[in-house]
Amino acid sequence: MTSPQSLNYYMPAEWYQHECCWMQWPHENPNRNSYLEVESWSHFDFEKGRHKWAEVAKAISNFEKVKMIVHPMDIKIAKTILHNSIEICKIKNDDCWARDSGATFLLNDQRKLGGIDWEFNGWGKFSPHDSDNKIAKFMIEQSSAEYFKSSMVLEGGSIHVD
């Protein structure tokens, strides 16, 4: 397999101009195994949280395009809460952390876009996470970026580049 490095791809600084911000809409998954085990999450007001999520997306959309990944079961509610400037992208998701399950985007010397699809394992604890493990590939395909698959388990957002 060809590596991003061999094709002169690099991860641009976080502040570097980019095409859009990817977010994931909070999906209330009744099959989620461990949220009630986390005391600070056990009393989470899901609907209030969704409205706050929408406020964040709207604020970001004042400066750049926002693409919101939304579980098919949540499309109707997302359309009623999200501002019409937010692009809704329909795909199953288990959680709302695009920072962790999403792609790591790259550029090469010709400013061609690439993306790494890491293995996402639900932080080693939460399940199911199989839908979230497909989010990065979806993002890369939707962005028409060159696809790089990694077998490394990694939260893509844990890498910071300045």
Feature map (PLM): residue ranges:
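The feature marks the mature, well-folded catalytic cores of soluble enzymes
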Residues: 1-162
